[in-house]
């Protein structure tokens, strides 16, 4: 049926979209305070970008991407996440020539063929940040603190920050060998996905959601068991910086996240309010990704927050947003001979920065007043031919329940003085 939206998508309607606008404004304000500039990348990219950037063995690339061949016989994919596109833009536009670090943020829709459920859609929205050009553990702490700052400004409670270090190319081979040794006796009992991961990337077995695989891997070696001295020192410094700014965390040595590009710091923010241990955001460091995508060796770190999941968590916690609804002024006309003058007044109010509306259905004055009340309008300006000829209008303050005549010349000042 063509008149229904595709499964896993959602219409954000008036009355609901204001919450989104508040959230977007809040994140932009935080970005200004932290020194991040906005970047906007295409919604679709060449498929190879995600295969190389996200990782060919990830669930995203293997099962969840919306991929198609365009009329030029090119393989194109709707972006499933924002980091790979931002890295591509950094490399292609030679942003490495700018003073480093380069700090960017983005907001927009992402696409994954996933099983729709509460707070999880096939088209979903993310806010994310990326920092390129610094290996300083203080930057890791900054992006983590920034994510928590956003959640706290929204008013979210009962969040748990999980952090880990997933090592680097120096210490990963040791972990790979130990994991393969550990899982080898259990290989036939692992799920089919993890049997494939055993050879390609056994670290991903720790990320499996299968209860059987989780049970088997309960005593498996972890990244913290094999960190090289440099990675261990880096992780200790990240914790020190988080301690310095009062950010509480849980060391989770089983946290590896679902993307192959992470190195060293990985983190996730969890809540119980939208399901057991559900993630509402996370990120980490990816020091080899820019080089993998054709750029110079450049360290990077970032995070992404799921906007639908944030709004669902806020709803479950009873958080309300400061939303302004309806016009400040509604012009109610008396008689058909005043419509042209009312329309001119309407446009003048708008040019003065006042949100204003009028009737376009020929309603009676009583019906217009009732409609203005439904719009949650503060002032109703009642304009008739007699009042207009005298250069006045009757202004009713719907909040105070009072009305008075006001000169049309002073109408803007009258309204602005009371709002």
UniProtKB/Swiss-Prot annotation:
Principal location listed in the UniProt entry: cytoplasm
PROSITE patterns in alphabetical order: AA_TRNA_LIGASE_II
Keyword Aminoacyl-tRNA synthetase appears in the UniProt entry: yes
Matches recorded under Pfam families: HGTP_anticodon, tRNA-synt_His
One example of a Gene Ontology biological process annotation: histidyl-tRNA aminoacylation
EC number: 6.1.1.21
Gene Ontology CC annotation, any one: cytoplasm
Name of this protein: Histidine--tRNA ligase
Species the sequence originates in: Desulforamulus reducens (strain ATCC BAA-1160 / DSM 100696 / MI-1) (Desulfotomaculum reducens)
Gene that encodes the chain: hisS
